[in-house]
């Protein structure tokens, strides 16, 4: 389940550190967080969709690694990001 292009562009615009920024950890984590939320809703309705469940767990792991990287490189950006996204940490 891919994100709608308009939603993805909106997220990129909100979290970009500069014009045209799509690769910063903040943008990547924000996009992954939205995809995780969407797939979580999908899984509530389709409990036995194991392919989606596996993809969801992979995304959660990828987001966790990116957050760990950001925490190790710049703790202030990390704290600002988890507060903006409402992630518990």
From Swiss-Prot:
Q: Which SMART domains match?
A: Ribosomal_S15 (SM01387)
Oligomeric form and interacting partners: Part of the 30S ribosomal subunit. Forms a bridge to the 50S subunit in the 70S ribosome, contacting the 23S rRNA.
Its GO biological process annotations read: translation
**Highest taxon, organism lineage:** Bacteria
Q: Keywords assigned by UniProt?
A: Ribonucleoprotein, Ribosomal protein, RNA-binding, rRNA-binding
Protein name per UniProt:
Small ribosomal subunit protein uS15
User: Quick check: keyword Zinc in the entry?
Assistant: no
Source organism (scientific name) = Arthrobacter sp. (strain FB24)
Gene from which this protein is expressed: rpsO
């Amino acid at each position: 389940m891919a994100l709608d292009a308009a939603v993805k562009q909106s997220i990129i615009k909100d979290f970009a550190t500069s014009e045209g920024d799509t690769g910063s950890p903040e943008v990547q984590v924000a996009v992954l967080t939205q995809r995780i939320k969407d797939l979580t809703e999908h899984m509530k309705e389709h409990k036995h969709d194991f392919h989606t469940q596996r993809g969801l767990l992979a995304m959660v792991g990828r987001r966790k690694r990116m957050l760990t990287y950001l925490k190790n490189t710049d703790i202030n950006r990390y704290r600002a990001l988890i507060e903006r996204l409402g992630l518990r940490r």
